[in-house]
């Protein structure tokens, strides 16, 4: 067993796309497969393991051994490196609630692929009220000159996301309750641009109202001031450009014109593609 010296104060940050990929792999598993495993891709920096991608590795588990298609895993990783050279192997994942007897064997392989791999488990069986996410590191155990082994020790794990992922998650959240309410549509289409601007403006107005209420309560000594909140508000004010109303209106109108130009060009391209498709079909029919 490979010796792994890893601090236990690590934090694993998993992006939503990784969780979706794991669930998708679990839904597509073979009928005789009890669980699914795969490779975690991402980066490690200053005690933070950020998992941004993953892929499934076909395998079979027997009573005394594990058979995994390691050649497939290596080829898929090489292909991913061509597209995302910044993503490296940081560990492996498995569906299920707990670590199994075969986990140490699989972890030994990933210990040869990267330094200090992590192990992520996702409870796709939904035994609890929520889909449980756990992360582990393998700590070597034993006495000098005697038998050695390893133990999977839990570490902190949290879900993080980029701004585009937040938009996608917000859209997915609107479909919650579709299964329990058959009258609701099963799909939700993205809103129009102006509708998104209107919704974002409404949320911004609500947040500004909460900030104003907080500031007024602090000034009226109804609430204790918070230095952290004060510094955050000061940074927010300094980040807003100081410009006149006419300059802002000119800049806004310029951006709107650019947006309308992009929309017009997109519609022209769409029309051209549709016309080309019809002409191609007509030519094939005449010939």
UniProtKB/Swiss-Prot annotation:
Protein name according to UniProt: Eukaryotic translation initiation factor 3 subunit F
GO biological process: formation of cytoplasmic translation initiation complex
PANTHER family the record matches: EUKARYOTIC TRANSLATION INITIATION FACTOR 3 SUBUNIT F, EUKARYOTIC TRANSLATION INITIATION FACTOR 3 SUBUNIT F-RELATED
Similarity annotation: Belongs to the eIF-3 subunit F family.
HAMAP family: eIF3f (MF_03005)
Gene3D superfamilies: Cytidine Deaminase, domain 2
Gene: eIF3-S5
Key words of the record: Cytoplasm, Initiation factor, Protein biosynthesis
GO CC entries: eukaryotic 43S preinitiation complex; eukaryotic 48S preinitiation complex; eukaryotic translation initiation factor 3 complex, eIF3m
Span of domain MPN: 12-142
Protein species of origin: Culex quinquefasciatus (Southern house mosquito)
Subunit structure: Component of the eukaryotic translation initiation factor 3 (eIF-3) complex.
Sequence intervals crossing the membrane: none
Chief location: cytoplasm
InterPro entries documented for this protein: eIF3f, EIF3F/CSN6-like_C, JAMM/MPN+_dom, MPN
GO molecular function ontology, one term from the record: metallopeptidase activity
Localization, UniProt: Cytoplasm
Function: Component of the eukaryotic translation initiation factor 3 (eIF-3) complex, which is involved in protein synthesis of a specialized repertoire of mRNAs and, together with other initiation factors, stimulates binding of mRNA and methionyl-tRNAi to the 40S ribosome. The eIF-3 complex specifically targets and initiates translation of a subset of mRNAs involved in cell proliferation.
């Amino acid at each position: 067993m490979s010796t792994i010296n890893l601090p236990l104060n690590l934090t694993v940050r998993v992006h939503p796309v990784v969780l979706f990929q794991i669930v998708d792999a679990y839904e597509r598993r073979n009928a005789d497969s009890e669980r699914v495993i795969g490779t975690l891709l991402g980066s490690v920096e200053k005690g933070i393991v950020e998992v941004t991608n993953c892929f499934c590795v076909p395998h079979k588990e027997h009573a005394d051994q594990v058979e995994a298609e390691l050649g497939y895993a290596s080829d898929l990783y090489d292909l991913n490196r061509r597209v995302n050279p910044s993503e490296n192997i940081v560990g492996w994942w498995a569906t299920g609630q707990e670590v199994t007897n075969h986990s140490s064997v699989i972890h030994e392989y990933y210990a040869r692929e990267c330094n200090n791999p992590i192990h992520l488990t996702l409870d796709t069986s939904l035994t609890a009220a929520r889909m449980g996410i756990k992360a582990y590191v393998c700590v070597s155990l034993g006495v000098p000159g005697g038998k050695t082994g390893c133990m999977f020790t839990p570490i902190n794990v949290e879900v993080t996301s980029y701004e585009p992922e937040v938009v996608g998650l917000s859209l997915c959240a609107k479909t919650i309750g579709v299964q329990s309410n058959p009258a609701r549509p099963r799909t939700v289409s993205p809103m129009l641009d102006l509708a998104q601007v209107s919704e974002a403006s409404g949320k911004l107005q609500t947040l500004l109202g909460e900030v104003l209420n907080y500031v007024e309560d602090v000034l009226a000594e109804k609430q204790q001031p918070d230095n952290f909140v004060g510094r955050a508000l000061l940074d927010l004010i300094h980040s807003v450009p100081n410009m006149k109303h006419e300059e802002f209106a000119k800049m806004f109108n310029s951006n709107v014109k650019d947006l309308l130009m992009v929309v017009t060009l997109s519609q022209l391209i769409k029309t051209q593609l549709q016309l080309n498709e019809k002409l191609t079909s007509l030519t094939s029919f005449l010939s």
